Design a protein with these regions (language model features):
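All-alpha prenyltransferase/terpene-synthase fold signal
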Residues: 1-247
Length: 247
């Protein structure tokens, strides 16, 4: 739980209090569960991206590999450390579910509403991650592919679904779901675009990781998708050279 912005629980708390809710233990458990789900998603994402740094510290699987090397463990340490990372991510997912749903003080109808939203959030994240991984095996993707991936992988579970969960906790009507969609989806896409831009212009100290990590990992961001499809030939050659240099 080191570092991070806590955007998702903040969004849920904001919508909960905006509808008149008062924070209590049950609500705090849901907020913690949302953040634990985010931690689970990051751990698995780092493994799939072969990431080594997160918020200025080694990723879970990288920390495990470094530890195993110091202990002079034997075997395929890369595979073993990634396996540990997968299992730790799974455990975070279990804890997220327990925090959100193992509650006796929440109204049954509220729990049912939370379950529906949480399930939709899970599905969106998984499908978005599949698009992300699929893009890594493609030389180029167009901007519609990147926008769909961003909408599903980032915007939904960063803004749309946390807003909906906060309103559900407060017992609000389902009509607020459309507002969460129209407000949260564009905000989430903008959030990801800013993150992608910082990867290009930020420093290692500012980012908590090495810059150009997206390009190095073969990630197709909106900037590069637009450039590859709407730029001139000189820009195309320069981007291809940059991509080859980093790889």
């Amino acid at each position: 739980m080191n570092g991070g912005k806590r955007v998702r629980p903040y969004m849920a708390a904001l919508s909960f209090e905006a509808y008149g809710g008062k924070l209590n233990e049950s609500v705090w458990r849901v907020l913690l569960g949302i953040e634990l789900f985010h931690a689970f998603a990051l751990v698995h994402d780092d493994i799939m991206d072969l990431g080594t740094d997160r918020h200025g510290t080694p990723t879970i699987h990288e920390f495990a590999k470094q530890t195993f090397k110091k202990q002079k463990r034997i075997g395929d340490l890369q595979h073993i450390s990634q396996s540990h990372g997968i299992l730790i991510g799974d455990m975070l997912f279990v804890w997220a579910n327990e925090c959100i749903f193992n509650q006796s003080k929440l109204d049954r109808n509220i729990l049912i509403a939370l379950q529906q939203i949480y399930t939709e959030m899970n599905q969106e994240v998984m499908l978005g991650q599949m698009l992300d991984v699929d893009g890594m095996a493609r030389a180029t993707v167009d901007d519609s592919h990147v926008l769909l991936k961003t909408s599903m992988k980032t915007a939904g579970y960063t803004f749309v679904q946390p807003l909906r969960m906060g309103w559900a906790l407060a017992g609000s009507p389902k009509k607020f779901a459309s507002f969460a969609e129209s407000f949260g989806r564009p905000l989430g896409i903008a959030f990801q675009i800013q993150d992608d831009l910082l990867d290009l212009i930020g420093t290692a100290e500012e980012l908590g990781k090495q810059p150009f990590s997206d390009l190095r990992d073969g990630q197709h961001t909106l900037f590069f998708a637009i450039h590859f499809y709407k730029r001139n030939k000189e820009t195309e050659r320069n981007l291809a050279k940059l991509h080859a240099l980093i790889h």
